[in-house]
Amino acid sequence: MPTASLETTINGAFDARETITPATRGEVRDAVDQALGLLDKGEARVAERAADGKWQVNQWLKKAVLLSFRLNDMSVIPGGPGNAAWWDKVPSKFEGWDENRFRDAGFRAVPGAIVRRSAFIARNVVLMPSFVNLGAYVDESTMVDTWCTVGSCAQIGKRVHISGGAGIGGVLEPLQAGPVIIEDDCFIGARSEVAEGVIVRKGAVLSMGVFLGASTKIVDRTTGEIFMGEVPEYAVVVPGALPGKPLSNGQLGPSTACAVIVKRVDERTRSKTGINELLRD
């Protein structure tokens, strides 16, 4: 089915989603399955960067991901420790893969790495024991470290390092208009969280424990400029706090958490955050 027809069919089905069930067959199911297949192979993306640097969200692909939950029934998924199983609607991306399939894909997936079908993993990616949700896109030479989560439809660029325990939010619950986007050459520090459609621009560095949502104030301590929803290119960001406003009794109120841009990336920063090509051979 041509892309334009896919989009039309999926948009129409989403408007009538209450009528979609696991018993639904025909054009709608075929369109959703085809859309998820395009996402799985990296031939389509939920969000794409235009030449002007703006990100365009393909809402119809996000709708296809959501519709798949209406179309697919629960089933037993084998492979748990101790011969246990799981009970879910979304199969593993790696279901049925053999050695040749992994070699062709060209990335590493160590034991404990979970990737759901319709997520795309590019060549030379390293997946430590982590979780990549459906519809996500992880580009070349990125490291997804231990206990990281890459949320539904999140877009991760090339040569990104997502450190241990960091979380990249998804779009499905709570429902978000746009996915989290981490552009090329970014470093996300351990136990940090980026959610609610925040964009981290090229080359930015988040230190350990930075929490960013759509309403988080990101303060440039050099200029005083405040950003929200977007980290500028090559910014080095640390956790911070804004002074509290006076309370009704005149006392100083509680401070408010924020993020602080302390500098722009320099060679010293690069030496601490650069990727190790030996891990990607």
UniProtKB/Swiss-Prot annotation:
InterPro entries: DapD_Trfase_Hexpep_rpt_fam (IPR005664), Hexapep (IPR001451), THP_succinylTrfase_dom1 (IPR023180), THP_succinylTrfase_N_sf (IPR037133), Trimer_LpxA-like_sf (IPR011004)
One GO term (biological process): lysine biosynthetic process via diaminopimelate
Binding site for substrate: R108, D145
EC number: 2.3.1.117
Pfam families for this protein: Hexapep_2, THDPS_N_2
Subcellular location: Cytoplasm
Keyword terms, alphabetized: Acyltransferase, Amino-acid biosynthesis, Cytoplasm, Diaminopimelate biosynthesis, Lysine biosynthesis, Repeat, Transferase
Top-level class of the enzyme under EC nomenclature: transferase
Catalysed reaction, written as an equation: (S)-2,3,4,5-tetrahydrodipicolinate + succinyl-CoA + H2O = (S)-2-succinylamino-6-oxoheptanedioate + CoA
GO MF assignments: 2,3,4,5-tetrahydropyridine-2,6-dicarboxylate N-succinyltransferase activity; nucleotidyltransferase activity
Cellular-component GO terms for this entry: cytoplasm
UniProt key word Cell cycle: no
Recorded metabolic or biological pathway in which this protein acts: Amino-acid biosynthesis; L-lysine biosynthesis via DAP pathway; LL-2,6-diaminopimelate from (S)-tetrahydrodipicolinate (succinylase route): step 1/3
Assigned protein family: Belongs to the transferase hexapeptide repeat family.
NCBIfam families listed in its UniProt record: dapD, PRK11830.1
Subunit structure: Homotrimer.
Name the record gives this protein: 2,3,4,5-tetrahydropyridine-2,6-dicarboxylate N-succinyltransferase
Protein species of origin: Nitrobacter winogradskyi (strain ATCC 25391 / DSM 10237 / CIP 104748 / NCIMB 11846 / Nb-255)
Gene (name only): dapD
